[in-house]
């Protein structure tokens, strides 16, 4: 038997089994996002060979075992467990499953042939044949996950909690930019603060940036700026809590002013600091600041 990890402790290796259509591809993507090297459609008899090559270089490994009509699924799984036990890796066997009606409807939406399909018997017979062959495998699993009622976000939460050991914090970048050089193409949210008082028209502040205290004080001196900031902080606080629960992989929030030197820089610095203080993995970035400085020096 493989050794199931204690609750909350990290899992080195995941043995993943499932009938076709039960969510194997989505599960592999989730494990990849969690930092696992995923090997899909591995024949059980080849597990020792894969482990010999990949175990030394992959501290986190997912072996998704293939089910084939001509193979003994239970014998193959037991052989895979024996190979893993010899390496003393902390392993969990996860079996994905769902009702045959769900599998049938999922295959109705795809053009891919079922691996157990027999032209003389039809799709439902193929689904039933594979699930019957996998019943002994399902019985040996440490965790059986019914993907039928689960949305993708729920499956992500479930599998993440199952393997444990690594927080899935949402990395957030808050970026300043200037509209005159275009909007960042990879931003999920773009906020325009060009309506706020502009330090550019103050001769003493024009050569400075939003990183300078004088510029920041000017930007936030007006009630308009203060109200904007409070509303923006409250909105982002709500937004990040929602995305954190949805287990997004990353988020880029772009805040723009005309040149990306004064107002947006001051806002980004303050926002990223306040959000980081509340526990979000937030960092500031200033896309156009270096370009602006080079242009000033070249004049």
Swiss-Prot record:
Kindly give the InterPro entries that the UniProt entry links to this protein: P-loop_NTPase, RapZ-like, RapZ-like_N, RapZ_C
Highest taxon of the lineage: Bacteria
Keywords in alphabetical order: ATP-binding, GTP-binding, Nucleotide-binding
Where is ATP bound in this sequence?
Answer: 18-25
The molecular function GO annotations come to: ATP binding; GTP binding; molecular adaptor activity
Q: Which Pfam families match?
A: PapZ_C, RapZ-like_N
The record's annotation in HAMAP family points to: RapZ_like
Give the family this protein belongs to, as stated in its UniProt record.
Belongs to the RapZ-like family.
Q: Which NCBIfam families match?
A: PRK05416.1
Stated role: Displays ATPase and GTPase activities.
Name of the protein: Nucleotide-binding protein glr4163
Organism the protein comes from: Gloeobacter violaceus (strain ATCC 29082 / PCC 7421)
High-level lineage:
Bacteria, Bacillati, Cyanobacteriota, Cyanophyceae, Gloeobacterales
């Amino acid at each position: 038997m493989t050794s199931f990890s204690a609750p909350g402790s990290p899992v080195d290796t995941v043995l993943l089994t499932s009938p076709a259509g039960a969510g194997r591809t989505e599960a592999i993507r989730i494990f990849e996002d969690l930092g696992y090297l995923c090997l899909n459609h591995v024949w059980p008899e080849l597990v020792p060979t894969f482990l010999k090559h990949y175990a030394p270089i992959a501290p986190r490994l997912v072996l998704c075992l293939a089910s084939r009509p001509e193979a003994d699924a239970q014998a193959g799984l037991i052989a895979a467990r024996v190979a893993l036990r010899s390496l003393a890796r902390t392993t969990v066997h996860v079996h994905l499953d769902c009702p045959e009606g769900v599998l049938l409807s999922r295959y109705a939406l795809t053009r891919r042939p079922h691996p157990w399909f027999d032209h003389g018997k039809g799709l439902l017979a193929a689904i039933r044949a594979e699930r019957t062959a996998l019943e002994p495998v399902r019985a040996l699993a440490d965790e059986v996950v019914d993907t039928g009622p689960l949305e993708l976000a729920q499956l992500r939460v479930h599998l993440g909690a199952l393997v444990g050991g690594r927080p899935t914090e949402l990395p957030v970048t808050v970026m300043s930019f200037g509209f005159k050089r275009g909007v960042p193409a990879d931003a999920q949210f773009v906020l325009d603060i060009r309506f706020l008082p502009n330090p550019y028209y103050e001769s003493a502040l024009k050569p400075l940036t939003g990183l300078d205290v004088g510029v920041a004080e000017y930007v936030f001196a007006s009630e308009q700026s203060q109200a904007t900031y409070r509303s923006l902080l409250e909105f982002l606080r709500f937004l990040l809590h929602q995305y954190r629960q949805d287990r997004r992989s990353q988020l880029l929030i772009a805040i723009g002013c005309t040149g990306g030197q004064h107002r947006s820089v001051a806002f980004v610095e303050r926002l990223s600091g306040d959000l980081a203080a509340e526990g979000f993995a937030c960092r500031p970035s200033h896309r156009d600041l270096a370009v602006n400085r080079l242009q000033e020096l070249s004049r």
